[in-house]
Amino acid sequence: MPVDGKVTFATSFMKEDGAYVDESMITGEPLPSEKQKGAMVMAGTMLSQGRLRFRARQVGEDTALAQIVKMVREAQGSKAPVQRTVDRAALIFVPVVACVAVLTFVAWVMFGGFDCVPQGIISAVAVLVVACPCAMGLATPTALMVGIGKAAEKGILIKDATALEQLRRIDTMVVDKTGTITIPNSNVDFTKTSSMPLEERETIKPNAAKAMTMLTDEGIEVHMMSGDTPEAAAYWAKKAGIAHYMSKALPQDKENLVRTLQEQGHKVAMVGDGINDTQALALADVSIAMAKGTDVAMDVAQITLMTDDLKALPEAVAMSRRTVKMIYQNLFWAFIYNIVCIPLAAGVLHLFGSDFQITPMWASALMAFSSISVVLNSLRLKYAI
């Protein structure tokens, strides 16, 4: 039974009232949450005040925290489409470099005679050593590991690298209203209409309007889908700052909107939290689920937001763009390195009367430096996002 400041070790159900739990590591919410009898306490959260008497439901690898760690590790180990392209290029690069090394030796012997055989061997070895597929191979995974890890710190769980790469292409985002833009209000009001039952009102999420503005500023068009009446949908859309909305939307309507937008040439992200969103989530180019939504929605989604702060949406887009930009930056410098260093190692400057040439010793140092520089450049991403 943890005391104040202790981390809970199991996902459990409370057996009595009177505890406040810091769930910021899971939900991103800074304030402790009051736990009553029957409430769930997530493993990895911290007891802020009171005492816990609970019945354990999940321990070890079954807890949400363990699943999050597993998901992040799998995502960091997954390959983005650009990485597959680089891998194919590397398969060609290695035999090409071997051929260049052989041609370097042959050229030295042909133009310099047998006296240049030692120089030919040195030059061929220098070419083999200085050529660095490692830098190209490290360019993508190092940036992805940093980007996905940084996203997890911000409460954005990315299931695979493809989603991170595709998110930067998004120009349209479809969002479900209830549970995404709004949350149920704990205050209950009576409506003064004889035929109307008791209604529970909603409230817009903090920073929802700001998040929509940030998305618009990034060039992303936002559409809101709601099952409400046209009047209610218009009210919430206006409050969130969303220009495009649909009322009385059924699950197939959400799917049809995503398909229509895609047919118009748009790259579409779908954000939802319920079973009724799963069809649209599965169809979208990038699918995003809210952590407090249904398990089905989270299973379908490629990205899960662990926080209710919708600013995580524009942050995720910005993170995707910066990560992919870093990948291409790494690849650019890796190719420039090889384009410059391989001819120098082969002794091409001798054709212009210069004796400068990269020796095998310097080639090994340059090869190591190129790999280290790619890693260090990727680590800059941690402080840029």
Where are these regions (language model features)?
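Helix-interface capping motifs at the ends of transmembrane segments in multi-pass membrane proteins
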Residues: 92-130, 155, 200, 333-365
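Actuator/coupling domain of P-type ATPases
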Residues: 11-18, 23-124, 197, 204, ...
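Transmembrane alpha-helix detector for multi-pass membrane proteins
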Residues: 126-149, 368-371, 376-378
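Juxtamembrane helix-loop transition segments at the membrane interface in multi-pass membrane proteins
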Residues: 142-161, 379-385
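Cytosolic catalytic headpiece
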Residues: 71, 159-276, 280-286, 318-321
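Conserved cytosolic headpiece of P-type ATPases
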Residues: 2-30, 52, 59-67, 71, ...
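Membrane-embedded alpha-helical bundles of multi-pass transporters
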Residues: 150, 185, 218-220, 240, ...
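Residue-level signature of catalytic and energy-coupling elements of molecular machines
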Residues: 5, 28, 41, 56, ...
